[in-house]
């Protein structure tokens, strides 16, 4: 998937990660063969690139060197990142800029909806930076974007990938009430890594958030993803699966962590394709409707196709239960 940022001002040459500037460089491991991909050159990729340029948008995929950019852009898939490009958190794995964000762009919901319509998207993913500076964590903005897309492109299915709305009472309820088709909130890693990898978040708050979505709307699909290769143990990953199933999460994604810069958390190891397949098999036995587990899996990768499969798998499960 393409992660797109709507920028209204040019870069101000600010330090992208000021909180990491003082840290020593970490070792960058050589990527194994199963991680490497060909440089994007297809006609579809070039057309998407021109489309993005014509909308005066900037892609995180380009800046971060996402390994899936060629495949996703060829298919004209898009994930829009809303509420600016500056995050109030400072996760050790993430390449999004950190600092004090700008004010919300009130035209953004309409602009995103217009782009969705013009690009002819059948399925769109909306994500955002964390906005701890806002009273509702950006819940109203998510709501407005969903409504705008529904009006501009009624046939488009909507998947949201949200922050955790930590200490924002009522925020989650507002977003769920806007009726996205899929609610995704990534756990990112196992609980033992949170203090070093995701220090601004709370593991069981995220589990509870996903559980609460199902309580508010039992028909809404829920989804979560993690990275591996951050030093986690296998038994920790299996326990995380159990925690997500306790929250009735439908869809789990597991992918390899790739280090953005030498200032970010190091890759402890590259998990083999065979291990990813093992995780997938185990996750299905635990009751997930959908599992995507591979080195290059990302939470929005193949999102449209996966949504169709997710619906079909639920229908099969309901039919089997009725027999």
Curated annotation (Swiss-Prot):
This is Lipoyl synthase. One of its GO terms (cellular component) is cytoplasm. SMART domains: Elp3 (SM00729). [4Fe-4S] cluster 1 binds at residues 61, 66, 72, 300. The keyword Transport does not apply. It is found in: Cytoplasm. Keywords: 4Fe-4S, Cytoplasm, Iron, Iron-sulfur, Metal-binding, S-adenosyl-L-methionine, Transferase. Belongs to the radical SAM superfamily. Lipoyl synthase family. Gene3D superfamilies: Aldolase class I. Its cofactor is [4Fe-4S] cluster. It comes from Allorhizobium ampelinum (strain ATCC BAA-846 / DSM 112012 / S4) (Agrobacterium vitis (strain S4)). Residues 1-25 are annotated as: Disordered. Binds 2 [4Fe-4S] clusters per subunit. One cluster is coordinated with 3 cysteines and an exchangeable S-adenosyl-L-methionine.
């Amino acid at each position: 998937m393409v992660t797109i940022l709507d920028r209204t001002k040019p870069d101000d040459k600010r330090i992208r990660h000021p909180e990491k500037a003082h840290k020593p460089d970490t070792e960058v491991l050589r990527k194994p063969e199963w991680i490497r991909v060909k440089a994007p050159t297809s006609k579809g990729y070039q057309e998407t690139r021109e489309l993005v340029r014509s909308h005066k948008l900037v892609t995180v995929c380009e800046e971060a060197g996402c390994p899936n950019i060629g495949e996703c852009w060829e298919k004209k898939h898009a994930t829009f990142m809303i509420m600016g490009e500056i995050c109030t958190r400072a996760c050790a794995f993430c390449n999004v800029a950190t600092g004090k964000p700008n004010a919300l762009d009130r035209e953004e919901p309409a602009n995103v909806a217009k782009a969705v319509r013009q690009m002819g998207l059948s399925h769109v993913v909306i994500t955002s930076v964390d906005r701890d500076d806002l009273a509702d964590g950006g819940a109203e903005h998510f709501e407005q974007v969903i409504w705008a897309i529904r009006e501009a492109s009624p046939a488009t299915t909507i998947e949201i990938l949200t922050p955790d709305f930590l200490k924002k009472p009522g925020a989650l309820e507002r977003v769920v009430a806007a009726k996205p088709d899929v609610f995704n909130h990534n756990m990112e890693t196992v609980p033992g890594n949170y203090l070093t990898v995701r220090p601004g978040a709370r593991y069981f708050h995220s589990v509870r958030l996903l559980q609460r979505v199902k309580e508010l709307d039992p028909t809404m699909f829920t989804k979560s993803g993690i990275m591996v290769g951050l030093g986690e143990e296998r038994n920790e990953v299996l326990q995380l699966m159990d925690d997500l199933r306790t929250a009735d999460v439908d869809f789990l994604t597991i992918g390899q962590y790739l280090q953005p810069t030498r200032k970010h958390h190091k890759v402890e190891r590259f998990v083999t394709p065979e291990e990813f397949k093992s995780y997938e098999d185990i996750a299905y036995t635990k009751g997930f409707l959908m599992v995507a587990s591979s080195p290059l899996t990302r939470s929005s990768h193949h999102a449209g196709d996966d949504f169709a499969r997710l619906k079909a798998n639920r229908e099969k499960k309901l039919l089997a239960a009725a027999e």
